[in-house]
Amino acid sequence: MNAIECKQVSVWYDDVCALDAVSLTVPEGDFLGIIGPNGGGKSTLLKTLLGLLEPASGSIAIFGKKPAEASRLIGYVPQFSRFDRRFPASVMDVALMGRLPARLTAFFSYSRHDRQYVETLLEQLEIADLKDRQIGRLSGGQLQRVLIARALAAEPRLLLLDEPTASVDTRSKEQIYQLLKELNRHLTVVIVTHDVGVISSHIRTVACLNQQLHYHGEPELTGGLVEQVFGCPVDLLAHGAPHRVLKEHGEGIA
């Protein structure tokens, strides 16, 4: 079964086109990286998959269901820079939010199973020792793991992440990608990223998005294609190391 099927999906913000006739199929078990310039529609695509935005035209199926019907099958990790660290909550409090039901009752409380499940997740993500720490006292990498734990607490089949390694140090970035690679053993993973340097070493397939879908396939991109999508030479994106986009030096770069 396919985890995601988008057919000719277009999304508009008033008179501005964010997505233009995007068709994309993601098989279950894939690890897809979506790259593209700022304003290219990457976050808009995630929001549309989540059912937060309604496409102006086209159709979307998540495991064969409409996004609104598949919400419990999806875990979402937003950019942590948009997460208010002043929120008075502990690591455990935030992770437990993933166990909240679709409809809350006045007397809702987490079950023992909920707490045990989340504690196990925190152990697997190597942040169990931080469970009582306030989120305002976490590093960027630690907070990102907490947000991943919250998403996994819902027991999803599809994990969507919006730039999970933005503003984290190099060591934390590598740890997060290794974690996602491990999670991909039993989850479909879709990640939005500007980090073209990780495309070849961590993900299975890549989608280049700039309002339209320019490429979807193996993570071996030519410099010309990336320049077409981003509108600038590939060496500007990879900080002087254009061959980091590919598996081996010289493959596909003229």
Features from the language model and the residues they span:
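ABC ATPase nucleotide-binding domains
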Residues: 222-254
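Conserved ABC transporter NBD signature motif
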Residues: 58-74
